[in-house]
């Protein structure tokens, strides 16, 4: 090459290089923007927990940074999801007088937006007879589905949802099938490979040439997201909204993937499944485009782009249209709040009793505890009840004896920091030398029984053996079927003891391990301070967890303790009782200024929320005088249980005139009935959370609708306990409240449908309604509706705190999540002092104007 040619080549290279670099830089920027939009969409999805650890979750949790009405508009336009109560439900409340003219007038006065819009009571009443004018933005799949030339028996949207859902079910299953897919390359790669071998999907969707399009799919999820989003030609400003709308078409599986991400973050890790699910759902739209001609594609792009150009305007229009729905939401809440305010003021004036307290009983804050606490206090003035989060402040995971089935026993917001295991502990100290040998024997016995059971059940999971298994084992299942058809009076079963020799079950006790004495003392001090039990302890202190009892119920964990991650509170109560009864721990507490009298004994117990019976644990460890007091309590428990069962009987369609024994028998049979879809109502009806001394709610009937947490501001000079209550239990109760709210307002999209049609997916992932569709999240219809009427009223939580205003404001200012909840209308916040109630509204307090209607 000549010198001139070399110089010319260098000049050309120098000229070309800047443009090449700019093109690459522009492409990198585009890819970054796409990744950011995908991440933003993924962050909008709230998690859902597996069936065996089911806890209630606000499905809009990731959107609380926006006002409720804005979220309602987004959900309607992007996902066809209803956030406020349906207008027919509100019309019924108005017609029946549940919402009064005074409630409506007070609401219009309370909402500045309603005043600015000039809404009158007449306007609001008229609006109840029509649906809000809302326009749903289409996705690419919707545009293609509307093509008049499409000839299939099933809409493409339905077919795609079914295919994606079945793929996810196979991929995530770890408990149901003995064969598991290869997961090392991720969900997207598994879906792509599955699709390549699915020769029936083309026939189902009327796309005989889809195989060629599948082969052209990008290899990675990131490339698929870029490939699709670049082709759609949508304005960048709406990318995240479009992608969120895509995820809402498979919201159930998106929520499951969000749970995997949530758990990974608790362990300081990352999880990519939600992004891969988004890529799968996006890629399906592009696949359909590959199967159509260019003219049809061009028309689809034009239609989609025109619709999404107006997305911001449609969202604003929806927000305006839903103002009336927000008015009726508040009016429904004010109708309840009037009665609540009157009760709280009257209770605050009641003088405390003078009888000496012989027993203190700490219950979970769960709304089902409130009627029983009230009944116990009525039955015997010598008992004082307390409200505390049902995990009793123990940040633990529990592993039953001879298993590796480690499970969290604390709120889903937290990660376990300590471990609880089972050990054989004899009651008599002189027998404890033999405990190690008994434990070894128990472990061997249990492992043997598990092995036999697993081999037996495996026969039903291999395809070739399924029918022969049914023929061979059919008669063996008649016993269980008989128990369901003719339910007996069996007590609540304890799965953690399954397979253990009966003679060892009573001395198999859960306890903390790996915790030094100083750490034990610190933990005990924190728990007692949180309960307000730092002085004047009674001779007996009950730690009463709670658990439900039902048969053949995939959602049984949802009726147990949410603070224990869908488990009963037994493990936490028993572990804490053992800890607080340790002499060395008590000595250490003395040094911290917490004097636990030597005669005080802590006793673990469990409230069966289905039958309202109380069961005690480790009673053989109690001294004689405590055993005598426990026997005295049995009559108190029976009397209180009778009262609560009679209160509950009308809502369960039981005979309220039946004898006490007959009512208890009916509830026990109900708890063992495998055909019973409504063993109890769980937390249906929940509407308030009261953080105050028990005196504030003592003696008043709160109808099992209030969470109750004891709190004495005079003992919390630095506000640290209040901060903990507003950032942990308040968030948990908010989650519960909004899951019930969401499942009532949109049972189709945010509820799990009909229990009678449920099929469990992957052993514990969730349920399908029938054999397909999206994974269903939320509560079943039978958990909210009695067949004629809704049992749950969709009210946002009213939080009532008896503490200095400055202390409450300090927590709000310090914690963004709390500020978002109160400022964006996700809950109501009241301050109570003496006989005065005040309402918090964006940094200001105003007198609660709730005159009786």
UniProtKB/Swiss-Prot annotation:
Belongs to the inorganic carbon transporter (TC 9.A.2) DabA family. One of its GO terms (molecular function) is zinc ion binding. It is found in: Cell inner membrane. Part of an energy-coupled inorganic carbon pump. This is Probable inorganic carbon transporter subunit DabA. Its main location: membrane. GO terms for cellular component: plasma membrane. Its cofactor is Zn(2+). Zn(2+) binds at residues 364, 366, 546, 561. It comes from Methylovorus glucosotrophus (strain SIP3-4). The keyword Disulfide bond does not apply. Keywords: Cell inner membrane, Cell membrane, Membrane, Metal-binding, Transport, Zinc. Forms a complex with DabB. Residues 7-21 have a biased composition (Polar residues). PANTHER family: INORGANIC CARBON TRANSPORTER SUBUNIT DABA-RELATED (PTHR38344:SF1), UPF0753 PROTEIN AQ_863 (PTHR38344). It is a peripheral membrane protein.
